Structure formats: C-alpha cells, structure tokens
Curated annotation (Swiss-Prot):
This is F-box protein At1g60400. It comes from Arabidopsis thaliana. PROSITE patterns: FBOX (PS50181). It comes from the Eukaryota. SMART domains: FBOX (SM00256). InterPro entries: F-box-like_dom_sf, F-box_AtFBL13-like, F-box_dom, FBL13/AtMIF1-like, LRR_dom_sf, LRR_FXL15/At3g58940/PEG3-like. Residues 13-59 form the F-box domain. CDD domains: F-box_AtFBL13-like.
C-alpha cells in the first residue's frame, strides 16, 4: 500500500486538486493571503480558488500603489458576495491608502458579513491623519471580534450603534472624537465578554462609563503622559480586571464579580487633604474589596498609604486569598496594615524593588497568625537588585512563618 502511494505521487498524479473545493479552501485559509494567491499559478483549477477563501490578511505595503491595492480588493470582495467573510485583517498606512478607498473597503467588508475584523494603522501618523471608521461598522450584525488600532471614531447616536454578536472588543490607541463613544459602544454589545482599551492621548472623553451585564474580562491601559479620563465600572459579571499605568482623578467601581481577579496599577492625581478625594479613594478600595486575587503595584500602594495616613483605616478584603504586591522601601511599613484587612489570605508574593537596609520588620500579631496558619509566602527580588541583609531577614521570617 505504501509503495503504491509513493509510486502514484512520483508519477505526477495531482491528488490534492482532486479534493473537494471546500476542503481546498479550508487548506488555503490556513496560509497567509500571499501564499494563498500564489497557488493561482499552479493550474487552471487553482486560478480563482483563493477568491473563495473567507479569510484575507493584507498590508498596504505589499502593493506598489493605491490603485493596485483597490483593484485587488475589488476583485476579492466582488467575486462571490454570497460567501460570508470569516476574517479580514489589514495593516495599512494612511499615507498610502486614500481615505475614500478605506471607507469603501470597510463598507464592502461589512456587506460580506465579516465575523472577525482587525484594522491597524501605521502607529506613527499624526492625529490629523487618523482614519475614521465608517458608520456601517457600528451596525454590523455578524461581527464577533473587533480589533482596532490607531484609528478614530466619531460620536454617534446610541440608536445607530448595534453590535449584537460582538464578544471581543480591542481598541488600541483609538482616538475618540466625542464625549460618550466608548460607553455607547460597549452598551451596544449585548454579549460582549472580553474588553481591552489602550487609551489615546488625544481623546475628548473626560469620563468613560463601562456598563455591561456580560463582560467577563476588562483591561484598560494608559498611553497618556499626563492625565487619563476618569472611569466608571458597572460590570457585575466581571471575572478579571486589569488596570495598567493608569493615572486619573477618579476611578469608580460600582460593581464587579464577587470573586474576581484584579491587577491594579493606578495612581490618582489628587490632594489627600481634599475630602472629595478621600471619598473617591474609599469608594475605589471598597469597590475592589470583594475580589479573590489581587496583584498591586507600588504606585497603587502609594495611594493606599496616602489614604491611610488621613483616615487611619482601610476596607476589609475578606474574600482575598491571594496577593502579589510590588514594594519599595518607603511602603514596607504599610504591608502589615494592609494584610491585617485580609483575614483569609493564604498566598502572598512580595516583590521587592530597590529595598535598602532597615533595622527591623515588624508584623502585626494578626498577620503572624495568618502566615503561620495558612498557605505560603514567596519573596521576589529583581535580578538587578542585590539582597541586603535585612531582605534576607525578611525572607527568613516569611519562610519561618509559612513553614
């Protein structure tokens, strides 16, 4: 049997072309668009086969000019409009692709009932050249995954925005030319589960409200040098929330899942003597106090330290079982205070960042009992930092208490 197959292959029989067309298209969909198009020269049978593939991945730099690019898109999109487009992924340079052609292209992709859409612009273009997404995109009934980078969005009436099947929404450096675009967009995605927003420094929005009954994962990351928009979160089913390098005057957590995991790196540009600032920080800490797992940055610990210095109290984190904290020397004394609010903690990872000599590390009796009775404690020191004798004492203390 094996010898027969080898002989048949060696005799030049084209067994691949004998496969059903839907299988061949499935094979081609696993290739890059470049390689898929190259198969058109194999034989007459393969000449137009790539046009039936419901996946397209392009870069405008692959084409000599805008006209050639448009001709290619025209041929692909117009070849068989009955075929649903599974995925369309384009990396374009606004300096090459004309604006009208871009709008036309996205419109046609939407008409082909696209499922996954990824649009990435050259990240180095100035704000004035960011291409605005066409209105048709905001009411695409077939879209499931939407990934946009370095484009712009106009403010639209809420009744004109409806994305009923979108489950994943990723916005990286998307400039929002309005004051309620994100909130409207998220609210229009009734089955949205995964939301990621990397802010744009030129946004007009001052307050962003994320309200969703379906979102399970939410990440927000700053690209601003100074102040980010204020945020409100109302996502009762949220299982994971990540806040990276964020800096704002307010971040309100109205609701998240009762046993969520959070990764918090946020700093508030406030005066701790201001009663409104103290109230806002209290509400933020209370909003995340029901989580089960937490990773917290030194910047956020600085906020907690400033808050504690004014009110001498912290909310109880009674559900918290796992904590990963990045500490610098000046915040070390806060650790026992914070952990004293975590009565059910059984896993503690302490990352030491540039600690110098300290005479003594004091831990509250409550923390001592917790460490000796539950879980484990792990110490991490950056590779570039040499452990001081005090750090070795701290590590020895943790080992002793967790043994």
């Amino acid at each position: 049997m094996v010898r027969t197959s080898i002989k048949s292959i060696g005799s030049g029989i084209d067994r691949l072309s004998a496969l059903p067309e839907h299988l061949l298209c499935r094979i081609l969909s696993e290739l890059s668009t470049k390689d898929s198009v190259r198969t058109s020269v194999l034989s007459k049978h393969w000449r137009n086969l790539w046009l039936h593939v419901p996946v397209l991945e392009l870069e405008t730099s692959d084409f000599p000019d805008n006209l050639v690019f448009r001709e290619f898109i025209d041929r692909f999109v117009g070849f068989d409009k009955e075929i649903d487009l599974k995925s369309f992924d384009i990396f374009y340079d606004v300096n090459v692709l004309w604006y009208d052609d871009f709008l036309w292209m996205i419109d046609d992709v939407v008409k082909r009932r696209v499922c996954d859409l990824m649009v990435t612009n050259n990240p180095y273009v100035v704000n004035e050249k960011l291409v605005k997404m066409p209105i048709s995109l905001y009411s695409c009934a077939t879209l499931v995954n939407l990934n946009l980078s370095f484009v712009a969005m106009n403010n639209l009436p809420s009744e004109s925005v409806c994305l009923p099947r979108v489950k994943t929404l990723y916005l990286h450096g998307v400039k929002l030319d309005g004051d309620s675009i994100l909130g409207t967009l998220v609210s229009s995605c009734s089955v949205l589960e995964d939301l990621t927003v990397v802010t744009h420094p030129g946004d007009y929005e001052k307050v962003v409200c994320f309200r969703s009954q379906s979102v399970k994962s939410f990440t927000i990351e700053s690209q601003c040098e100074y102040k980010d928009p204020n945020v409100e979160i109302d996502c009762p089913r949220l299982e994971y929330m990540c806040i990276r390098e964020y800096q704002s005057e307010s971040f309100v957590v109205h609701s998240i899942g009762p046993y969520a995991k959070v990764d918090v790196d946020i700093f508030f540009e406030v005066e701790y003597e201001d009663p409104l600032a103290i109230s806002m920080i209290r509400n933020f800490l209370t909003g995340i106090s029901k989580v089960r797992e937490m990773t917290i940055s030194s910047r956020t610990l600085e906020v907690i330290r400033g808050y504690h210095s004014m009110v001498k109290a912290l909310p109880q984190f009674s559900n918290l079982s796992s904590l990963d904290a990045l500490l610098v020397e000046s915040y070390w004394e806060l650790l026992p205070v914070f952990l004293g609010c975590c009565i059910n903690l059984n896993s503690l990872v302490v990352e030491l960042d540039g600690l110098s000599e300290i005479e003594e590390f004091k831990v509250s009796p409550l923390l001592q009992d917790s460490l000796s009775a539950r879980g484990f404690v792990q110490q991490k020191t950056p590779v570039s930092v040499t452990k001081t004798s005090s750090e070795r004492k701290i590590a020895a203390y943790f080992v002793k208490k967790s043994g």
